[in-house]
A protein has these predicted regions:
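Acidic, glycine-enriched active-site microenvironments
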Residues: 436
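Conserved short beta-strand edge segments in small beta-sheet-based binding/regulatory domains
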Residues: 371, 440-455
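Residues at or immediately flanking beta-strands
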Residues: 149, 211, 400, 448-450
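Inter-lobe coupling/hinge segments of SF2-like helicase ATPases
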Residues: 1-355, 359, 395, 407-410, ...
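Short proline/glycine- and acidic-rich turn/helix-capping motifs at secondary-structure junctions
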Residues: 396, 400-413, 450-459
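Short amphipathic alpha-helices within nucleic acid-binding modules
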Residues: 430-432
Length: 459
C-alpha cells in the first residue's frame, strides 16, 4: 500500500472487528493508526455507531487525529424509515393470550399473506427450547464438560452444548422414556423458546403456500446453505424468513414490508455492560430490513420491558434516547469509553493450579500499579475491587483491579476459567504493565493465560 489515500470501515460497530484470539487487536484501531501513518482519511460507516466512535467525535480528537461526525438522517431516494410498534407482552398475557405472537404481529402477518409480501422475524435463540427442567426437583441438565445449560433441539431429540458442541440424546416429557438425570422423574419439561419452536408455530399458523424459512447456526452448517436459503426467500412469492442475529443486517429485499422481533428482552439482560448497546444495534439493524422498496415498512417489537431506553430509542429511531442513559451509566460505573478495560483470562483442567496462577498474576498487577491490597478470590464478577475502594475521580488517575473471580462461564471444555478485569485511565500503557506483571507471575503446567487489552468479551 504505497499510496494509500482513503480507508473505509463499513458497519464499524460490529464486534467481529475485535479479534478475540491471538493476535488480539481491533481493526478500527489498526485502521486509525494506518491512516495517521499515511496521512489519509478514515471513514467509519454505521447506522448504529459504537460508543467509542461517538465519544471520540464528541471530544473532537483522539490520539492526535481529528474526529468528526457526519449524519444522514433520511434514507436515500424516496424510501422512509419504517414505523415501529411496541407490543407489550404483559398486556397480552393479562388479556388471556398465550400465543408466541402478539395480536399486532398476528394482524401484520395476516396482512403480509393477504398482499403476498414478505416478512422477516428475529428470534436470537436457536434450538427448540432454551433448556429442559425437571418439574419435580428443579434440575436443569448441564454439559458434562462446561458449566452451561444444554439447549434442546426437537429435530434430533438432543440436548446440545453451544459452548463446546457436545450432544446428548434425550426424551422430554410427555414422550416415552423421559427421565430427569438427577431424580428420575419423567416430568422433564421444555422451557424457553428457540427458533425451531417458532418455526413450527409459524407453519401451523400460515397457509401452506407461504414459505417459512429458518436461518440460524443449525440450518446453515453445510457449505452454501446460507446463500441457498436466501435464494429460496428471494424466489418465493410470499415468505417469512425467521432467524437469529445473522439476518439482522446485509439483507436488501424490497418485498419485505414487515419485521417482527419475537422477544427483544433476551438481548437486553445479558451480564455485560455493552448489553444495551448491542441490543440497540441488533434491533435497529433488523428494523432497517423493512420498507426498503416502494411499499412502506412496519416493525413490531414484542417485549415485557416497553419502557426500557433501548426500546424507546428504536421506536423513535433516535439513538440519543438510549445513548444519554447508557453513557451516564458507563460514566458512573467507570466503563469504556471513559476508561480502558483489560481482561486477563486464566484457564486449565486443574482448578487449583489455575486458581493459584490467577492469584499470583493479581498480586503482580498490584505491585505493577502500586496498589497494596491483598488479593482475594471473589465468588462473582465485579463484587468489588479486591478490597480497595476508589471513587470515580480517583480512578481517572490510577488503575483499578477487579477480581480475580471465576468467569461467568466458570468451566468450558473441561477447563476451569478465572479472570481479572483491569480498569485504567485513558492513555495508560496497559499493554506494557500487563505484560510485565504476567511475565513476573510465571507459568503453571497445563494452565493457559490470555491478555485482552480493550476487551469486548468478559464472559
Amino acid at each position: 500500500l504505497a499510496d494509500l489515500g482513503l480507508i473505509v470501515i463499513d458497519e464499524e460497530h460490529e464486534q467481529s472487528y475485535k479479534q478475540g484470539s491471538s493476535p488480539r487487536y481491533h481493526a478500527r484501531e489498526v485502521a486509525a493508526k494506518l491512516a495517521r501513518l499515511h496521512g489519509c482519511a478514515l471513514v467509519l460507516g454505521s447506522a448504529t455507531p459504537s460508543a467509542e466512535a461517538l465519544a471520540r467525535c464528541e471530544t473532537g480528537s483522539h490520539d492526535g487525529a481529528r474526529w468528526t461526525r457526519v449524519e444522514m438522517p433520511e434514507r436515500p431516494g424516496t424510501a422512509c424509515l419504517p414505523e415501529v410498534i411496541v407490543a407489550d407482552l404483559r398486556r397480552e398475557f393479562v388479556s388471556g393470550s398465550r400465543s408466541i405472537f402478539s395480536k399486532p404481529l398476528l394482524d401484520a402477518l395476516d396482512e403480509v399473506v393477504e398482499k403476498r409480501q414478505k416478512a422477516v422475524l428475529l428470534h436470537n435463540r436457536r434450538g427448540f427450547a432454551s433448556f429442559l427442567m425437571c418439574r419435580e426437583c428443579g434440575c436443569v441438565p448441564t454439559c458434562k464438560h462446561c458449566s452451561t445449560a444444554l439447549t434442546y433441539h426437537e429435530r434430533t431429540h438432543t440436548l446440545e452444548c453451544h459452548t463446546c458442541g457436545s450432544s446428548y440424546r434425550v426424551r422430554p416429557y410427555p414422550e416415552y422414556g423421559s427421565a430427569c438425570p438427577k431424580c428420575g422423574s419423567r416430568y422433564l419439561a421444555k422451557m424457553g423458546l428457540g427458533t425451531q419452536q417458532v418455526e413450527d408455530a409459524l407453519r401451523a399458523l400460515l397457509p401452506e403456500d407461504v414459505a417459512v424459512i429458518r436461518m440460524d447456526a443449525d440450518s446453515t452448517r453445510t457449505k452454501g446453505a446460507h446463500q441457498k436459503l436466501l435464494e429460496q426467500f428471494d424466489a418465493a412469492e410470499c415468505a417469512v424468513l425467521l432467524g437469529t442475529q445473522m439476518i439482522a443486517k446485509g439483507l436488501d429485499f424490497p418485498e419485505v414490508t414487515l419485521v417482527g422481533v419475537i422477544n427483544a428482552d433476551y438481548a437486553l439482560k445479558m451480564p455485560d455492560f455493552r448489553a444495551g448497546e448491542r441490543a440497540f444495534d441488533l434491533l435497529e439493524q433488523v428494523a432497517g430490513r423493512a420498507g426498503r422498496g416502494e411499499d412502506p415498512g412496519r416493525v413490531i417489537i414484542q417485549t415485557y420491558l416497553p419502557d426500557e431506553p433501548v426500546i424507546r430509542a428504536v421506536k423513535m429511531h433516535d439513538r440519543s434516547v438510549f445513548t444519554e442513559h447508557d453513557l451516564d451509566m458507563r460514566r458512573e460505573a467507570l466503563y469504556p469509553p471513559y476508561v480502558r478495560l483489560a481482561n486477563v483470562l486464566v484457564w486449565g483442567r486443574d482448578e487449583r493450579a489455575a486458581r493459584g496462577l490467577v492469584m499470583r498474576i493479581a498480586e503482580e498487577l498490584r505491585v505493577e500499579f502500586g496498589l497494596d491490597a491483598t488479593p482475594m478470590l471473589h465468588p462473582a464478577v465485579e463484587t468489588g475491587s479486591a478490597g480497595v475502594e476508589f471513587s470515580s475521580r480517583e480512578l481517572l488517575s490510577r488503575p483499578q483491579i477487579l477480581g480475580p473471580t471465576p468467569c461467568v462461564i466458570e468451566r468450558a471444555k473441561d477447563r476451569y476459567r478465572f479472570h481479572i478485569i483491569v480498569k485504567a485511565p485513558l492513555g495508560c500503557d496497559l499493554s506494557g504493565a500487563l505484560s510485565a506483571a504476567v511475565s513476573r507471575a510465571g507459568t503453571r503446567p497445563g494452565v493457559s493465560i490470555a491478555v485482552d487489552v480493550d476487551a469486548y468479551d468478559l464472559m
